[in-house]
Amino acid sequence: MPATAISELRIAVKSSLTPAELDDANALVSEARWNQVAADWRLFVEHGRVYAAHASCGRIVATSAILPYGQHFGWISMVLVGGPYRRRGLATLLMRRAMDDLSAARLVPVLDATPDGRAVYGALGFMDCWGFHRLRRERQEARRVDPVLPAGVSVRPITDADWPPLCAFDAAAFGAQRNAVLGALRGRLPAADLVAVETDRIVGFCLGRDGRIAAHIGTLVADNDAIA
C-alpha cells in the first residue's frame, strides 16, 4: 500500500456497526491479540464514540474510541491499526480526532498504554501517571475456595437492590460516575458478580467479562486489600 493512501481513507464516527463492520473490528482485535469481543464494541458505540478508518473497499482498517466519564475526563481506547496500514500516522490521526472531541467537550483525555502505543501517546503530550500489570492465570480445574474474610464482612452475589449503592460506592472510589459501563459488564461473567458487605454497607465489589482469549476479572473496587 503506498504511503499516500492514508489520505484517501475515510474517517467516520460510528453510531452503529453492521455485522460486516463488526467482523472488521474484531479482526483488528484478533490481529493485535487483544481480548475484546462484540459486547465491548457495543459498549463504546452506545455510551461513547467509535472512530473508524475505512479503506476504499469499505473495510474498516483502523479504529479508536472514547468513553466519557462524568464532566471531568474521558477514556481513549481501542486504538487499533491493521498490519498493512501501520507506521503511517494513522494511529496518531485517529488519536487526534478522539482528543479533539474530548477537548471540545472540556474533558481531559486519559488512556492506558501498551508498550507499542506508549511512544505514539507520548508524542501527543500524554504523561505517565501510574502503571499496572495485567496478569494471566492458566485454566485449572474448578474447585471451591472459601476466602478468609475480615471480621464482619460477607461476600455474596450482587442483587438488584445492591446496584444503586454499589454504583455510588464505585463513583466515590473511581472519581466519576460510570453506571452505564458497570451495567454493561454485569452478567457477562456471572461468577465474578460479587459484592462485599459489612453491616449492610457495601465495602467492595467485583465484576468481570467474557473475552476472546480469556475471562477478565475487573472492575474490582474495595475498601482495603483484604476485602479485595
Regions found by a protein language model. Name each.
Residues 1-10, 16-23, 43, 55-59, ...:
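Intrinsically disordered, low-complexity, positively biased terminal segments
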Residues 2, 113, 124-144, 209, ...:
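Active-site/acyl-donor-binding loops of N-acyltransferases
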Residues 31-49, 63-86, 94, 99-100:
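Basic, Lys/Arg-rich alpha-helical nucleic-acid-recognition elements, primarily the DNA-binding modules
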Residues 48-50, 130-134, 191-193:
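Short hydrophobic/aromatic beta-strand or adjacent loop that forms the aromatic wall/cage
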Residues 60, 88, 92-93, 104-109, ...:
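Conserved active-site alpha-helix within GNAT-family acetyltransferase domains
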Residues 77, 112-113, 158:
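Small/polar loops that bind or transfer phosphate-bearing groups
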Residues 129, 134-164, 168-170:
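Surface-exposed beta-loop interaction hotspot
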